[in-house]
Curated annotation (Swiss-Prot):
The keyword Acetylation does not apply. PANTHER family: BETA-GLUCOSIDASE, BETA-GLUCOSIDASE G-RELATED. InterPro entries: Cellulose_deg_GH3, Fn3-like, Glyco_hydro_3_C, Glyco_hydro_3_C_sf, Glyco_hydro_3_N, Glyco_hydro_3_N_sf, Glycoside_hydrolase_SF, Ig-like_fold. The gene is bglG. Belongs to the glycosyl hydrolase 3 family. It is found in: Secreted. The active site is at D304. Gene3D superfamilies: Glycoside hydrolase family 3 C-terminal domain, Glycoside hydrolase, family 3, N-terminal domain, Immunoglobulins. The keyword Secreted applies. Keywords: Carbohydrate metabolism, Cellulose degradation, Glycoprotein, Glycosidase, Hydrolase, Polysaccharide degradation, Secreted, Signal. It catalyses: Hydrolysis of terminal, non-reducing beta-D-glucosyl residues with release of beta-D-glucose. Its main location: secreted. This is Probable beta-glucosidase G. Residues 1-20 form the signal peptide.
């Protein structure tokens, strides 16, 4: 690879990334959280630590893809070698990623677009709830319909491929800058969300791209540091290496991606950082071994933008598509060449790369294209995308793109109603003393906080901004708003109908330093609503876990004088909440990033039109210092490969860690209140198969891996009752405790089931949880397979990870042979 690189880059001067969209964060503030890598840290270099798995497996059309696979093979047989190189190499163009057309074969190319909460490079498109918001619903129907609706908009804008959904980051660190793009700090909940999201996109006719595969758990040093005085490939320091052991990889980080593969995901996006030394996009153990062999993945692997660091080595390791195709930071210097492109042609001609491997790369790309019928009547790319795409503006295009069809087409349909409902269903009621909520015909309301009002920095959240509601985070995972309903706007609209007096103060500095009794007139309000926000973005990890803009002191200032202070947070995820125990803080709502209907969603909950049923997809600790697994934010050495993140906590992230060490928390994983109350009773468990062995039957691999792992082996049922006075939705959760003889490090309990159950007052309903073999298995590093341990399991069902009300014991393994 080194000699090829010298051929490519000899004589090239350093190039700037003009006009591209940058996502690397600025330097951290002095008071920011900081974790300096110890000097004695073991350093994993790029080679020799992650085992080689070669050659890259050929696709076979498994998983009902046989007809599409045959079409793809026929298509490849008609290509010239140069066209084959084009099919695996991105080009700058109207979309975030582009594969050029081949008109003589009737192939119109491929359009790849961000992202996980909206089609970002588009106008007149909806901005949906963020991943963490969707996960907070704990609602399978919502997880599916959110992806389906987004898929409809992607397709209508001419995008074949949605760069979504996100399972990496999983949420190892509370400070992760992109945690909000993903779902939950738990592999099971994230896995369900991934599977349903993939199905939703595909049912809308759009290819899903689970990302970022794998171990992408922090933003700091996710990419190499390039030499500003060198060529476009000269690196001063390599990207951080996520060093993960085999069992942790399988039981935590691979788990939700297995769900995505099981759902027949079209493509996977490999991540930026290194993994056990080797860059993720040229790590053959991960791409060939885990994904294509163990999980039977039949689609293609694309690089994250600029995540390709070699040509031949990456191709052999299992990378099928280089995005966006160029060199340098984020691959946005196409005029400097490409690791793929013409070098693929050259490598085939000189025998360095077998042409059959290139053929399989394209078969993998084209099979889902045919499977989803994208060769038939697919909408053209909206020409406005070319004007909005700052990643590859027209001045950088090297090829012609025939952009036809309606410009700035409105693809939103009636999705606003769906987004509003999703935001309300995701809202988590953390505290509700004295039945402060729902609001009861208030005569006067006081609104405080810089999150309440209209956004003040345009339609796209490119950076943090002081004034205006926060409905999305920043980076490639954000969306372009056509409108945002602010909380203040929605409250004023609702209050007008009831002749309620609404007064508001949106300057946090003023509120935090003022006696608020001097602000409101003529008498104290019935309730004081404080709106707070927390920004997070791609490219940098969070500097703290507190709310932004001195929000804590805003709450304390208001609560000193108002005995009915209600706090609402629009946040990327975990916040320290030092005001939670204040006696005058009567209610707290966590709304995360709800998308364009933000204000309407929260008003529906505040006034009781919707009974809150959101539940936490992570743990809120009492103190930020209680969290483990910090991101590496600084190193004390200068070696080129010194940036390391050792996942020494192994399986102990989030609630698993707090449970294992018996640490008190403020609000536990799965927690959330309602305007009603629920009870559980009559737990029962029955096997679904006659005999269960520890070792699974070795069946032919299908997408998702060994089909035996996906077999339902036990059914657990419980009765849920609404014991309150209003209708509501219960969220029963099932947790499994493994036998004592399971290998050391097994968490005390693990989520393995959940449901969302609407109930009228006094109504009861039986709920069933079906446990698959994989749900009762651990990864055995010796035999390299999933095993159900012999002995007694404890099954608990409750309403959070620490509110477990029903328990039953089972002994699944009845066949020890």
């Amino acid at each position: 690879m080194a000699s090829i690189a010298h051929l490519i880059f000899s004589g090239l001067l350093a190039a700037t990334v003009a006009n591209s969209q940058q996502y690397e964060g600025s330097s951290r503030n002095e008071d920011a959280f900081n974790y300096v890598q110890p000097r004695n840290t073991t350093i994993f270099g790029q080679y020799g630590h992650s085992p080689a798995v070669l050659p890259s497996p050929n696709s076979t059309g498994l998983g009902e893809w046989h007809a599409a696979y045959a079409k793809a093979r026929e298509f490849v047989s008609l290509l010239t070698l140069e066209e084959k190189a084009d099919m695996v190499t991105g080009q700058p163009g109207p979309c975030v990623g582009n594969i050029v057309a081949i008109p003589r074969l009737g192939f119109n190319g491929l359009c790849l677009q961000d992202g996980p909460m909206a089609i970002r490079v588009a106008d007149y498109a909806s901005v949906f709830s963020a991943g963490v918001t969707a996960a907070s619903t704990w609602d399978r129907d919502i997880l599916y319909e959110r992806a389906f609706a987004m898929g409809q908009e992607f397709r209508a804008k001419g995008a074949h491929i949605a760069l979504s959904p996100v399972a990496g980051p999983l949420g190892r660190s509370a400070y992760g800058g992109r945690n909000w793009e993903g779902f939950a700090a738990d592999p099971y909940l994230t896995g369900i969300a991934m599977e349903l999201s993939v199905q939703g996109y595909h049912d809308a006719g759009v290819q899903a791209t689970p990302k970022h595969f794998i171990g992408n758990e922090q933003e700091t040093q996710r990419n190499p540091t390039f030499d500003p005085n060198g060529t476009v490939t000269d690196v001063l320091q390599e990207a951080l290496s996520s060093n993960i052991d085999d069992r942790t990889m399988h039981e935590l980080y691979l788990w939700p991606f297995a769900n995505a593969a099981h759902a027949k995901a079209a493509s996977f996006m490999c991540s930026y950082q290194r993994l056990n030394g080797s860059y993720a996009c040229q790590n053959s153990k991960v791409l060939n071994g885990l994904l294509k062999e163990e999980l039977g993945f039949q689609g293609y692997v694309m690089s994250d933008w600029g995540g390709t660091h070699s040509g031949v080595a990456s191709i052999e390791a299992g990378l099928d598509m280089n995005m966006p195709g160029g060199l340098g930071p984020y691959g946005t210097i196409p005029e400097a060449g490409s690791f793929f492109g013409g070098n693929v042609t050259q490598a085939v001609k000189n025998g360095t790369v077998d042409e059959a491997r290139v053929d399989d790369m394209i078969v993998r790309i084209m099979t889902p294209y045919y499977w989803l019928g994208q060769d038939q009547d697919f909408p053209s790319v909206d020409p406005s995308s070319a004007d909005l795409n700052t990643f590859s503006p027209r001045s950088t295009w090297l090829r012609e793109f025939n952009l036809t069809g309606e410009r700035s087409r409105d693809v939103r349909g009636d999705h606003a109603k769906l987004i509003r409902r999703h935001g309300a269903e995701a809202t988590i009621l953390l505290k509700n003393e004295n039945n402060a909520l729902p609001l009861k015909s208030p005569k006067a309301l006081a609104i405080f906080g810089n999150d309440a009002g209209e956004p003040t920095m345009g339609a796209v959240n490119k950076a943090n901004f002081e004034f205006g509601t926060l409905a999305a985070g920043g980076g490639s995972g954000t969306g372009r708003f056509t409108y945002v309903v602010s909380s203040l706007e929605a409250i004023k609209s609702r209050a007008k109908r009831a002749n309620t007096l609404v007064q508001y103060w949106l300057n946090n500095t003023e509120v935090a330093t003022t006696d608020v009794t001097t602000l409101w007139v003529p008498t104290p309000p019935d309730a004081c609503l404080v709106f707070l926000k927390t920004w997070a973005e791609e490219g940098e990890d969070r500097e703290h876990l507190s709310v932004d803009y001195d929000g804590n002191n805003v709450v304390f200032s208001v609560a000193r004088k108002c005995n009915n202070t209600i706090v609402i947070t629009h946040s990327s995820g975990i916040n320290e909440l030092p005001f939670a125990d204040h006696p005058n803080v009567t209610a707290i709502l966590a709304a995360h990033y709800p998308g364009q209907e933000s204000g309407n969603s929260i008003v529906d909950v505040l006034y009781g039109d919707v009974n809150p049923s959101g539940r936490l997809p992570y743990t809120i600790a009492r103190n930020g210092s209680d969290y483990n697994a910090p991101p590496t934010t600084e190193i004390a050495t200068t070696g080129k490969e010194d940036w390391q993140a050792w996942f020494d906590e192994k399986l102990e992230i989030d609630y698993r860690y707090f449970d294992a060490h018996n640490i008190s928390v403020l609000y536990e994983f799965g927690f959330g209140l309602s305007y009603t109350t629920f009870n559980l009773s009559d737990i029962n468990a029955e096997p679904l198969v006659k005999s269960i062995s520890s070792v699974p039957e070795q069946l032919p691999i299908q997408p998702g891996g060994n089909p035996a792992l996906w077999e339902n082996v036990y059914n657990v049922s419980v009765v849920v009752t609404n014991s309150g006075d209003v209708k509501g939705k219960a969220v029963p959760q099932l947790y499994v405790t493994f036998p004592d003889n399971t290998p050391a490090g097994t968490p005390p309990k693990q989520l393995r089931g959940f449901d969302k159950v609407p109930l009228k007052p006094g109504e009861s309903r039986a709920v069933s949880f079906q446990l698959m073999r994989r749900d009762l298995s651990y990864w055995d590093v010796v035999s390299q397979q999933w095993l159900i341990p012999e002995g007694e399991f404890v099954i608990r069902v409750g309403f959070s990870s620490r509110d477990l009300r029903e328990m039953i014991r089972i002994t699944p393994v009845t066949d020890s042979t």
